[in-house]
Amino acid sequence: MTTGKTAPRRLSIFGSTGSIGRNTLNVIEHLGGRENFEISVLTGNGNVELLARQARSSGARLAVTASDRHYESLKRELSGSGIAVASGKSGLMEAADRDADWVMAAIVGTAGLAPTLAAARRGADIALANKECLVSAGDLFIKAIREGGGRLLPVDSEHNAIFQVLEENQRHAIERVILTASGGPFRNASLEEMKHVTAETARAHPNWSMGLKISIDSASMFNKALEMIEARHLFSLNPDQIEVIFHPQSIIHSMVGYTDGSVLAQLGAPDMRTAIGYALSFPRRPKLPVERLDFAKLARLDFEAPDEVRFPALRLAHLAMTRGGVQGAVLNGAKEVALEAFIEGRLAFLAMAEITERVMDDLAHLPPAAGMDDVFSADRQARQRAAELMKLDLVG
C-alpha cells in the first residue's frame, strides 16, 4: 500500500550566499524544508562561513566556492560534516552536472554562464536570476533549454510578472510588453544634477534593498536595459514590442498588452520571495508570508514616461536588440568596466552610457556567437576597449 507521498524535489542553488540565494533558502524553509526538498548543491564565492552554515542547515550534498583560494577555508568549515567540497570553474561545472531537477541560477556576472548553460543542457528546470545568460548569450541559452527539455522560469520580478500573466495559447496576440521601473533615486533629477551624481547617492534605491553595483545599475537604468534584452529572449519578442514605464510605487511589476486592447498586469508588494516561490512551485501557487496589498491604503498608482536623454541606457538596449549578435555581451562588458570606474570616482555618472555606446559602435562588426568562446571573446574585447577609451580620456 502506497502513502501517496511524493519524493522530495532535488534542488541546486548557484549563488546561495547572495540576496536571491538567501531568499530562495528562506522560501524553501517556508515550504517545508527537507520534508519537501533535497538540496543537492550550494555554491558561493568568498563568504565561506555563510556558505558552510547554509550547507549544514540545508543538508546539501556538495558545497562549491567559485574561488580556488577559498577552498581550504571551506573545507575546514565543513570538516566532519560529510558534505563534499569543490572550488573554481571545475567545481562550478561539477555542480552543474549534479542530479538536480531544479536549479536556481543566481551567480552574478559571466561566471554563472557556463554552469547554468550546462545545467540547462542536462535538462534541469532553470530558475533564472543571472542576467548574463540571456543578455550575453541569449540565443545559445534558449537553444540549450530547448535541447535539454527543461523549463525556463524567470525570477527577476519584472519577467516573473510577465510569465505569470502571459496566456500561453495567446502568444500570437501579444502586442507589447511593458516593464515597470521605479525610476530610482534620480527619477526627478535634472540633467545638470545627474552630471554630479556620486556612487553614494546612486546606491539609495527607493523601494528595494540591494548591493552597491545593482543599486547603481538601477539608478542609471542599465539594469532595466538588461531586462529589456532578457525579455526579448524569454518571450520571443521584437525590440519594438518592449516598452518601459516609470512606476515609483513598484506595485505593478510588469504588464502585457494584447491586440484586443486588453492589458494584463501582475501586482504585489516588492518582495523577491513571491517570484522565487512561483518559480519553485510552478505551475502551482505557494502560500508565502509576504505583505498583502491594501488597495485602500495604497490609494494611487503613478506612471511616467522615461527620459532617454537622462537615462540613455534604455536607448542602448534597443540598439543592442536591433543589431543583435553579440551586442548584448558587448553592452554588458563595457558597462561593467564603466561601472567600476564610476564607483572608483574615475568616470562621471552619465559617461557610463557614453563609453558603453562608443564600445558598442567600435565592436558592431563582430559576428554572431557560434559558441560560448565567441561570447567570452566579445565580453573580453568590450572590456578591453572600454579600458582603452578611459585611458585615452575620450569620454567625460
Swiss-Prot record:
Mn(2+) binds at D156, E158, E227. Its cofactor is Mg(2+); Mn(2+). Transmembrane segments: none annotated. GO terms for molecular function: 1-deoxy-D-xylulose-5-phosphate reductoisomerase activity; manganese ion binding; NADPH binding. It catalyses: 2-C-methyl-D-erythritol 4-phosphate + NADP(+) = 1-deoxy-D-xylulose 5-phosphate + NADPH + H(+). Keywords: Isoprene biosynthesis, Manganese, Metal-binding, NADP, Oxidoreductase. GO terms for biological process: isopentenyl diphosphate biosynthetic process, methylerythritol 4-phosphate pathway involved in terpenoid biosynthetic process. It is an enzyme of class 1 (oxidoreductase). InterPro entries: DXP_reductoisomerase, DXP_reductoisomerase_C, DXP_reductoisomerase_N, DXPR_C, DXPR_C_sf, NAD(P)-bd_dom_sf. Its EC number is 1.1.1.267. 1-deoxy-D-xylulose 5-phosphate binds at K131, S157, E158, S182, H205, S218, N223, K224, E227. Belongs to the DXR family. Catalyzes the NADPH-dependent rearrangement and reduction of 1-deoxy-D-xylulose-5-phosphate (DXP) to 2-C-methyl-D-erythritol 4-phosphate (MEP). This is 1-deoxy-D-xylulose 5-phosphate reductoisomerase. It comes from Rhizobium etli (strain ATCC 51251 / DSM 11541 / JCM 21823 / NBRC 15573 / CFN 42). The lineage of its organism: Bacteria, Pseudomonadati, Pseudomonadota, Alphaproteobacteria, Hyphomicrobiales.
